[in-house]
Amino acid sequence: MGRVKLEIKRIENTTNRQVTFSKRRNGLIKKAYELSILCDIDIALIMFSPSDRLSLFSGKTRIEDVFSRFINLPKQERESALYFPDQNRRPDIQNKECLLRILQQLKTENDIALQVTNPAAINSDVEELEHEVCRLQQQLQMAEEELRRYEPDPIRFTTMEEYEVSEKQLLDTLTHVVQRRDHLMSNHLSSYEASTMQPNIGGPFVNDVVEGWLPENGTNQTHLFDASAHSNQLRELSSAMYEPLLQGSSSSSNQNNMSECHVTNHNGEMFPEWAQAYSSSALFASMQQQHEGVGPSIEEMMPAQQSDIPGVTAETQVDHEVSDYETKVPQLSSQ
């Protein structure tokens, strides 16, 4: 009984289709191998299984090279070389553009592979990198030379021209720095002044009073309360402070015919003499103004003859006490 001829049509069962492909694939690859060895030809075999697994075979020449030869053939030769077992089917390629695109991609990948495997191409890339490194080193050296202009080494100078050029460069740089500083100060002057200003705690009244205490020169006497200050300096300071008061009191006493109270200083080395005038009428007038709403006026309570009390000086009192002492001493001695 003979072998049943298999009908050539698509196998509907997926498992049977995969098994049939595995069996016939091995036989097809074996036939291609035998053909490439026996006939010494360039052969390329590409297959995709029903599960989209790729199977490749090539003889002594790579698949990329075989396809490159196919692309370089004229169009007529490629069309005439197509072989169809079914003679009723005319050669027709529906997706010719797609095939050409795939072949071009394969050619590009082939060129890349050749460049990688070719040592000459690698050496050319290394040479380009070396040239780039040299160029960057030159730029770095030029930048270092520019920086050395701002820190010149006088030992390296051999002529006066080099000194003059270096001096001019430094002066120009200094000018630019000063201009930049002035620009920044002009822009930030308002904020700088606001941060450095301090408010006056005492106010204008206290400042005027303190300035009145100081001499006319306006110098700040930092040694005012210094214990180590010399007596002459203290005397000069006190005279400068109380001289306006003495002048004012003496002028007012001369105008109003008032008596003065003089205090004599027996130790004149330490402190100078000073005098202060008091007016009895002015004193009572001020007291009367302060106590107007409290009771009757002082002038009504006092007699008319006591309205003006003569001033008694300290010198008169001292003389009177001395005279009394001189009269009492003989009396005590006689007893």
Swiss-Prot record:
Compositionally biased spans, kind Basic and acidic residues: 317-327
PROSITE patterns: MADS_BOX_1 (PS00350), MADS_BOX_2 (PS50066)
Transmembrane segments annotated in the record for this chain: none
BP term (GO), one: positive regulation of transcription by RNA polymerase II
Subcellular location per the Swiss-Prot or TrEMBL entry: Nucleus
Disruption phenotype: No visible phenotype under normal growth conditions. Pollen grains from the double mutant agl66 and agl104 have severely reduced viability, delayed germination and aberrant pollen tube growth.
Cross-referenced CDD domains: MADS_MEF2_like
UniProt KW keywords: Coiled coil, DNA-binding, Nucleus, Transcription, Transcription regulation
Signal peptide positions (record): none
Keyword Coiled coil among UniProt keywords: yes
Domain MADS-box: 1-61
Residues in coiled coil: 124-151
Gene Ontology CC terms, in alphabetical order: nucleus
Positions of region (Disordered): 302-335
Biological role: Probable transcription factor that forms heterodimers with the MADS-box proteins AGL30 and AGL65 and is involved in the regulation of pollen maturation at the late stages of pollen development and pollen tube growth.
Subunit-structure text: Forms heterodimers with AGL30 and AGL65.
PANTHER family in the cross-refs: SERUM RESPONSE FACTOR HOMOLOG (PTHR48019)
Record's protein name: Agamous-like MADS-box protein AGL104
